[in-house]
Design a protein with these regions (language model features):
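Flexible helix-coil transition and linker loops at the boundaries of alpha-helical arrays
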Residues: 8-13, 269-282
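Short helix-capping/linker turns of helical repeat alpha-solenoids
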Residues: 15, 46-48, 78-80, 110-112, ...
Length: 346
């Protein structure tokens, strides 16, 4: 989000912790973490507890765990149960099981019930499932939906499917719960109920895993409308493979403008340093073939030839003729004739 400037920032009294905190919080709320950090650090030096709380969130967000520990420890050790819980999370992220466990237990003993889930989750991640259940169950029975879902996973892994189902149904406002219910009913071959829960997870809670399952389901069932719907939801979250699949669909429909747009989103997204894409799932030759056709339609002939050159899809006569027709429609008759001739020898 664009930085929002506030008046008189240069005239702030450094000893005014509350004012510094409010300035930092305003920047934080408006998406400027760098400026938020600057003022929250000054407020934290004056012992402002809420400044430390937000500052720790910023450092956790950017994985600056040593800084988060530095600001949290003094106040956490003074008995603040929320900061004890957050410090437990810092140590969990640092894979320091003993200190994470210590601070979560400290927070629980000081009355912070949310730490029951966090400690249960810690035990779960370190494969201490019996201990995880000991802390998750009281939290789940107090309507902590994250605890209900994680407890259900443990019961499911232990073969206690009925117990898993019971706790998933208790988590009424949790997309992961609906996704897991869909998975559970799918394994029971109750496809109608599975689909119902998966669609709730995908459409209402924007659950990515449910969207992935559903687009594949509808692709297998030749339901193009719903396949496109769930691919579009995934694309909205920058799921790179979905751009390629949508591009392929639109290319097959001769909607080359939309196909080109989706392929371009894929190529641009793939360049990002944090891009996650499994190229094993993508038919690169088909991608280049379809993108080449889009380029012809949009008059980008050099790009077209770059993608079509030595493409394995041009070993099929009908595909060669399709490309030739596109060049003919684009009034590139010389190239069209070359493709028509080559189709005779495929």
């Amino acid at each position: 989000m664009e930085n929002i400037e506030f008046d008189n920032f240069d005239n702030i009294d450094n000893n005014n912790s509350e004012r510094l905190y409010q300035m930092g919080k305003n920047y934080y709320d408006n998406g400027s973490d760098t400026l938020a950090e600057k003022y929250l650090k000054e407020a934290a030096k004056g012992g402002h507890r809420n400044a430390v709380f937000i500052l720790a969130d910023i450092y956790l967000k950017y994985n600056k765990l040593n800084l988060a520990e530095k600001y949290l420890k003094k106040i956490a050790d003074g008995g603040d149960f929320q900061l004890q819980d957050k410090l437990g999370t810092v140590y969990k992220r640092k894979s320091n099981f003993e200190l994470a466990e210590y601070y979560y237990k400290l927070a629980i003993n000081n009355g912070y019930q949310k730490s029951r889930y966090n400690l249960g989750n810690l035990y779960y991640q370190f494969n201490k499932k019996n201990l995880a259940v000991d802390y998750l169950k009281p939290a789940a029975d107090e309507r902590d939906q994250e605890a209900q879902v994680l407890l259900a996973k443990i019961f499911y892994d232990n073969g206690q499917v009925d117990m898993a189902q019971e706790y998933l149904y208790k988590a009424k406002d949790n997309g992961e719960a609906y996704y897991l219910l869909g998975k559970l009913y799918g394994e029971k071959q109750d496809i109608e109920t599975a689909e119902k829960h998966l669609r709730t997870a995908a459409d209402i809670y924007d659950n990515r895993r449910a969207q992935e399952v559903l687009y594949k389901l509808y692709a297998d069932n030749n339901n193009l409308t719903l396949e496109k719907h769930y691919l579009t939801l995934l694309a909205d979250e920058n799921h790179l493979e979905s751009f390629v699949l949508l591009g392929n669909i639109f290319s097959d429909e001769k909607n080359y403008n939309l196909a080109y747009t989706n392929y371009t989103h894929f190529f641009e997204g793939k360049k990002r340093s944090n891009a996650k894409v499994d190229m094993k799932k993508i038919d690169e030759e088909k991608l280049k073939f379809n993108f080449g056709k889009c380029c012809i339609k949009l008059g980008k002939f050099e790009d077209a030839e770059r993608n079509l050159k030595d493409n394995s899809y041009l070993k099929i006569s009908d595909n060669v003729i399709e490309v030739a027709k596109l060049y003919e429609e684009a009034e590139q008759l010389k190239i069209a004739i070359q493709y028509y001739k080559s189709a005779l020898h495929v």
